[in-house]
């Protein structure tokens, strides 16, 4: 979840609109990292778990921005967003897939369509 926070709050930086996430006026970064009031922001439980008090939470949150998001992470988030896939652990994806009763990640491609293993996978997964 916090990786997605970082992805969103760094979008204006990656786009060259600002030099730092705090410089973008519509970002939640100033609330999350600097403690500025914003009636539009409702802190997520994962954010609240960063520390027991607001000052330490903000310090910890700012520290998350010391490291860049990897190209793979950026690609994974973009793919999930653009293709309506679910992003998360295997357990989380399975849970969501069961609740929605539909595939929420890319289908397995290729394979020998005449093989018993392929036909069984199709029967089980509907792929």
Would you name each region that the model predicts?
Residues 1-127:
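Short Pro-Cys-Gly-centered "Cys-loop" motif that presents a nucleophilic cysteine in a tight turn
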